[in-house]
């Protein structure tokens, strides 16, 4: 993949926000399925139109809304029609219903953040048999269910980054826990497995992973799971939440219960939601966290879909394609034997830069 320096990514993020603001996607939900459909403005992209669909994990998640905003921005540049669907719940069943609806509509492509690695295969393979181009984005599906995967960052890189954060924040020893999304979420599961692999190194020997809890990417359930962890493990030192919903819920619990100086927090979070909780003192629970720009993830997903539809790529290793303001990307081999396009490395947010980014996304 062509390397891009952080300053380029940051300029892209700022440009995205200037175009779309810091809110969610611009579509209005209609119907029981939560479909948002918008017709993009005329553009000068070689794809020359097309209908591009995005199915996110679930509704009510600001991360998903910003990802959808980036998707719609790119489709507008491509001169096509964007259809965004947000399932009511983060389940494979809700997504299967939406896939079938999109197949019936005759869309040109479907990009999906999978709620289950394998359960979507019958519906997605049926879509591909109809000539619809299918890619996964943000959360993967199996290799038979996609042509390529738009990945935020490499799984091993995320696992190493988060594990090193736990090691640093804990002082190198003690109990820690993970607060994840759903137990079927392919992306979180891959990151957690990578963290466990990293933990096999001797330098992590004094750290004890006591539990992986699941908040299902629902705020209240994530609050409940955080409270349960605190009750079950009074000696807990660190919670790592590789989910934007989970980290925000955990931060609120630690603040409300006066535990910000006792139990520390790290993971993946949105700067706009976590700014009040990031700091180096006992009044702040999160010394630092990581993420990428979800607007860029959605933006790259749309350009990937367009390249598949136009035939510029098939999803094979070493194919390259332009992705608007983000530049050129190269398809690489994924850990599961399929292929992927990686947006870029995770970025660290701490007390020194959070004010700079909290108004961006």
Which role does the model predict for each range below?
Residues 12-13:
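Repetitive helical segments and hydrophobic/amphipathic motifs
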Residues 17-21:
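C-terminal motif of bacterial Sec signal peptides marking the signal peptidase cleavage site
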């Amino acid at each position: 993949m062509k390397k891009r320096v952080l300053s380029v990514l940051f300029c892209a993020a700022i440009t995205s926000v200037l175009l779309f603001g810091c809110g969610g996607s611009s579509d209005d939900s209609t119907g029981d399925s939560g479909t948002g459909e918008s017709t993009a403005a005329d553009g000068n992209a070689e794809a020359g139109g097309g209908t591009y669909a995005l199915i996110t994990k679930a509704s009510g998640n600001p991360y998903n809304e910003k990802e959808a905003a980036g998707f719609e921005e790119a489709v507008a540049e491509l001169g096509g029609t964007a259809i965004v669907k947000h399932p009511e719940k983060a389940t494979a069943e809700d997504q299967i219903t939406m896939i079938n609806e999109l197949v019936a509509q005759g869309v040109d492509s479907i990009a999906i953040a999978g709620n289950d690695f394998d359960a979507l295969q019958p519906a997605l393979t049926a879509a591909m048999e109809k000539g619809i181009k299918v890619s996964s984005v943000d959360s993967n599906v199996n290799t038979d269910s996609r042509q390529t995967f738009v990945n935020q960052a490499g799984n091993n890189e995320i696992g190493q980054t988060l594990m090193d954060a736990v090691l640093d924040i804990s002082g190198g020893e003690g109990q820690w826990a993970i607060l994840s999304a759903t137990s079927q979420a392919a992306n979180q599961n891959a990151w957690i497995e990578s963290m466990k692999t990293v933990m096999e190194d001797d330098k992590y020997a004094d750290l004890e992973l006591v539990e992986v809890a699941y908040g299902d990417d629902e705020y209240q359930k994530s609050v409940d799971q955080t409270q349960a962890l605190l009750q079950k493990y009074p000696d807990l030192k660190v919670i790592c939440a590789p989910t934007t919903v989970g980290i925000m819920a955990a931060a609120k619990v630690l603040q409300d219960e006066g535990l910000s100086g006792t139990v520390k927090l790290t993971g993946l979070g949105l700067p706009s939601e976590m700014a009040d909780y990031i700091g180096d003192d006992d009044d702040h629970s999160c010394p630092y966290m990581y993420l990428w720009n979800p607007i860029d993830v959605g933006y790259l997903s749309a350009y990937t879909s367009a390249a598949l539809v136009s035939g510029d790529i098939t999803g094979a290793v070493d194919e390259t394609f332009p992705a608007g303001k983000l530049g050129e990307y190269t398809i690489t081999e994924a850990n599961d034997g399929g292929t992927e396009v990686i947006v870029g490395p995770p970025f660290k947010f701490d007390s020194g830069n959070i004010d700079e980014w909290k108004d961006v996304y």
